[in-house]
Structure formats: C-alpha cells, structure tokens
C-alpha cells in the first residue's frame, strides 16, 4: 500500500495508509468479527465453517486486483481493504471457536492457551516470510501465491469438519 507504483505498490501517503489500514481496515475487521460471532451463535460452527473458510480466502483477491490495476482512488483502495478485513474478521471467528470447542474438558484452560499460541504462530510465521517473498517475486506474483496457498485453508477446513464429526460421534 505504501510502496510507489514504480515498485508495484499504490504509493499511499502515511495519512492515507493510516486511514485505510488504521480506520477502514479496523472497522471492517470489527464488523466481520461481530457478524461471524452472530452467525455461529445462531447457526453453529458446523453450518458456518465453509462460508467462514471461504471468507478468509476469497477476499485476498482484492489485493491481487489492487496489484494489477494500481488504483489511485483512495475510495477504491479503502473499499478493497474493508472487504478483505470483513472477510478476515468473519472467518477468523471460526478459527477461534474451533479451538475453544476442541479443547473442552480436563485442563481446558491450558489447552486453550496452547491453541491460541499456535494460532498466533500460524499468523506470525507466514507474516515474517511474506515480506521476503514479496520482494523476491513482486506484488502480483506474491498475491497469486497467496491465493494458491488458500488450498491449505480448504484442507484445514476439511480436517476440522472431520474432527468435529468424530467428536460428535464420541458423545
């Protein structure tokens, strides 16, 4: 978002970046989280697991769009970031709720803490590697790689559904 167009970025000023990431993005993330929590509360995690997994992956295409068209309109950039963050917030609720549901029982607080640590690690490790990868391949190729790596989310969703069904069968 900050890199200049000559480097494949959008060239946002610090003020524009603050507005897009710090205000619009946070609002989208919060809205997505609220909608995700309400969805699970009313329909259960099994019903919403696939839509939430897809909401984590499909909005990544907004960054691919931005890398191809390099819009200079702050409204378009803000809208793309907002949509991606709503999807992320909505989908991330499934991640949190799955861990909470999976660790019930004896020593559940210790297991929940460990689960949250792995959750943080699953975010930090790719984030640490992403800057290096983006510099090596450029923004467009990087976002194509991000979309292709979404297959891992689909595989994790399948495994989560299998785990939930197995846990229900034991009850």
Regions found by a protein language model. Give the residues of each.
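Short amphipathic helix-loop junctions that connect adjacent transmembrane helices
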Residues: 1-17
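Helix-terminus/helix-capping segments at the ends of transmembrane helices and short amphipathic helices
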Residues: 2, 96-104
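Transmembrane alpha-helical cores of Major Facilitator Superfamily
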Residues: 19-27, 54, 82, 113-121, ...
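Hydrophobic/small/kink-forming positions within alpha-helical transmembrane segments
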Residues: 30-31, 61, 124-125
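Helix-to-loop junctions at the C-terminal end of transmembrane segments
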Residues: 31-48, 134-135
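C-terminal transmembrane helical hairpin of 12-TM major facilitator-type secondary transporters
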Residues: 47-95
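A late C-terminal transmembrane helix in Major Facilitator Superfamily
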Residues: 102, 106-136
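Multi-pass alpha-helical transporter architecture, strongest
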Residues: 142-171
